[in-house]
Regions:
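A short, well-ordered alpha-helix in the C-terminal region of glycosyltransferases
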Residues: 189, 327, 334, 341-355, ...
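Aromatic "clamp/platform" in nucleotide-sugar-dependent glycosyltransferases that forms part
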Residues: 261, 280
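Short hydrophobic beta-strand element within catalytic cores of glycosyltransferases
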Residues: 41-43, 297-300, 310
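A conserved mid-protein helix/loop that constitutes part of the nucleotide-sugar donor-binding site
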Residues: 19-27, 198-224, 238-245, 326
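Short His-centered aromatic/hydrophobic patch
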Residues: 91-97, 115
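A short helix/loop element that forms part of the nucleotide-sugar donor recognition site in Leloir-type
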Residues: 179-193
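Helix-loop-beta element that forms the nucleotide-linked donor phosphate-binding surface
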Residues: 54-58, 153-175
Length: 381
């Protein structure tokens, strides 16, 4: 099917910090067939993902920029494509694609674009939303293959872009790594939480769309009803300083525990009882899948992507984003007080991930897109 040489793929992503897209890329690199493909990763910032890729002996490059459509880096990207003799460019997210498409098109290298959630949303300022819709329309039209991580992402694309086409390939996770039967570190002892207390966990960037501040306010209300609750918040971001200020004002420092981003996510999840994801929007949240695979009961918002995974009262609790603090408080109180419900939801959540969201299956589907593109574009390897 292929020539003697391996197919060289440049995987491009906006940052080296760990988020959903970066976790997706790590899973792809862990499972890609190295007998056929020779992956190279380009990130536009440094971070823990880069260190993990180096541990995996994946060739990595950093071309520093935090701006989309940054013409200052386009020549550097072109030089990298030529140096590494890249056959396919695979961009994860719009910022990465905006800084790579020009060089790839000039060199006639086919482009795959994975949409990890759109960059435009209903709660944005109308001008900003309009600008981002124009940007996404332009970028998706430059890709030879568009991959949507959820059906809702594909449907949104079709709604806004008349000629938009995409293949849906759901995110998948390493279910051996996120297996509750494994041995784990005692995180509760590290953060001084008793085994008998109910521990909620939030693992995400501290950004407005993840709503960490709403979670803190909701937790404070729930704590008045159930004083044996604790909340572990793991991550970094713009709203972390505000979060620390709010818990001090509310005088609940004893019940909320902060940790920076960490690699030992399975250990963190193993220590918890309830995983909370109060996002305003999602693509197909990998952190949610990891928590479900670890047998955690879920509270999440009824938003695109998430609602393709969670069925309310079946494998988790879905709440509306309208009146979020009130809805989240009620869900926390309800689930924290009902151990049998937590057990039932967790068991169903594990089954959902086992049946539908496997990283190996995801990777094989992406590889099929690569091989089809090579044949259709008659790319010399």
């Amino acid at each position: 099917m292929f020539r003697d040489k391996k197919i060289k793929i440049l995987e491009c992503i906006r940052q080296g910090q760990i988020g959903g897209g970066e976790s997706h890329l790590l899973s792809l690199m862990e499972n890609i067939n190295l007998e056929i493909y020779d992956p190279v990763v380009l990130s536009f910032t440094d971070g823990p993902m880069i260190e993990r890729l180096k541990e995996m002996n994946i060739c990595t490059y950093i071309i520093p920029t935090e701006k989309p459509f940054d013409i200052r880096v386009w020549k550097k990207v072109a030089a990298l494509l030529i140096k590494e003799k890249i056959n396919i460019v695979h961009c994860h997210g719009s910022r990465a694609l905006s800084n790579v498409f020009k060089a790839a098109k000039n060199l006639k290298i086919p482009i795959v674009y994975t949409i990890h959630g759109w960059s435009f949303h209903e709660d944005q300022h109308p001008f900003l939303k309009r600008l981002r819709i124009m940007s996404e329309r332009f970028l998706t039209s430059r890709a030879d293959v568009n991959i949507a991580v959820s059906k809702s992402n594909m449907q949104t694309g079709k709604k806004y872009f008349p000629h938009f086409k995409a293949t849906v390939i759901n995110n998948g996770i390493n279910q051996q790594k996120f297996n509750p039967a494994n041995n784990f570190k005692n995180i509760r002892a590290e953060v001084n939480v008793c085994e008998s207390d109910v521990l909620l966990i939030f693992i995400a960037r501290f950004t407005s769309h993840k709503q960490p501040l709403s979670l803190i306010k909701s937790f404070a209300e729930a704590l008045k009803i159930n004083p044996e609750l604790h909340l572990l918040m793991v991550g970094d971001g713009d709203e972390k300083k505000k979060a620390l200020k709010i818990i001090k004002q509310l005088k609940i420092e004893h019940a909320i525990h902060f940790l920076p981003f960490r690699q030992d996510v399975p250990d963190l999840l193993a220590a918890s009882d309830i995983f909370v994801l109060p996002s305003l929007w999602e693509g197909l949240p990998i952190g949610l899948l990891e928590a479900m695979s670890m047998g955690k009961s879920i509270i999440a918002t009824n938003v695109d992507g998430t609602k393709e995974i969670i069925q309310n009262e079946s494998n988790g609790l879905l709440i509306e984003t309208d009146n979020l603090v009130h809805n989240l408080t009620n869900a926390i109180v309800h689930l924290a007080s009902d151990k049998d419900l937590r057990k039932r939801l967790a068991e169903k959540a594990m089954q959902t991930v086992s049946d539908n969201f496997n990283a190996t299956t995801m990777t094989r589907k992406i590889e099929k897109q690569y091989s089809t593109l090579i044949l259709n574009k008659n790319v010399l390897v």
